[in-house]
Amino acid sequence: MCAVLCGFAGMALATEMGGGAYPNGAEGFFAGAVPPPGTYFINYFTYYTADSFNDSSGHSSVPGFRVDAVGNVFRFVHVTNKKVLGGLWGMHVFVPLVNVSVRVPGLSESRFGLGDIIVDPFILSWHSKNWHWATGLDIYVPVGTYDKTHLANPGRNYWTFEPVVGFTFLSGNNFEISCKFMYDINTENNDMDYKSGQEFHLDYAVGKKFGNTTVGLGGYYYTQITDDKGPTVGPDGNKGMVFAIGPQVKYDSKGRSFVFSYQKEISAENRPEGQKFWFKYICAF
């Protein structure tokens, strides 16, 4: 049976086909604007549900399929006063907790556990009047709950190295365009003799701020660049693709921000097609 990957830390069914380590859609407004020097806490809560697993032609291919995934991720960000190449040096770590329920014909399972931790010790950010830029290299450390005999796994059992570039443009009349670009390079899952292909994906948001509230649209685009490698790989290389779009709202209040977003997936290939809900809380220490 092919894999299902969704939500934080790549919750999986059987093999790795169908998605990447990154939880697509996690970022939106201010995706490229790293905050000023200081220490920050960000909490992500997400719910993903899908009742269709599409083949390479975009048609539902697994009768009776369903996945429901709930993730809560604690992120800690520290930005220093030190500059490298003119940009402020920062770092962050993500610690995800995941519950995933999967159903396929004749089988079902629900499992809770620690997802793979993400670290980046070298984030650089640049700021001007209207433009903000950031770069980094996120490293997905395979410490999450994983057992190849289970239908659902919060962890992935392999490393992912993810170069990141993000930008945010803010106009004089409070119009915003933000985008975060990522490219994933995966190592082999030795327990399954399976290596997921390289992936390109981006999160985006376009919005307008009215007072303390920003409203707009956002989502993500994901496409797999190289073929998977392993004994269960089909002739199309198990290459996945999906696009998602939906409304986003952000509210700022006294050093805190609250973000709500909904994302509807369309045109999925070799992966689930469903919908996501996000709640994001940001505060400075």
Where are these regions (language model features)?
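Transmembrane beta-barrel strands of outer-membrane/channel proteins
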Residues: 41-49, 91-97, 135-141, 179-183, ...
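Surface-exposed strand-loop-strand hairpins of Gram-negative outer-membrane beta-barrel proteins
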Residues: 16-20, 48-71, 105-110
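Sec/Tat signal peptide C-region and signal peptidase I cleavage site
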Residues: 8-14
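Outer membrane beta-barrel transmembrane domains
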Residues: 17, 60-61, 192-285
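Short loop/turn motifs that connect adjacent beta-strands in outer-membrane beta-barrel proteins
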Residues: 15-17, 30-38, 81-90, 104, ...
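Outer-membrane pore/translocation modules
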Residues: 96-196, 236-238, 252
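Residues on the lipid-exposed face of transmembrane beta-strands in outer-membrane beta-barrel proteins
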Residues: 31, 43, 74-78, 119-124, ...
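Transmembrane beta-barrel architecture of outer-membrane proteins
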Residues: 21, 26, 67-75, 114-119, ...
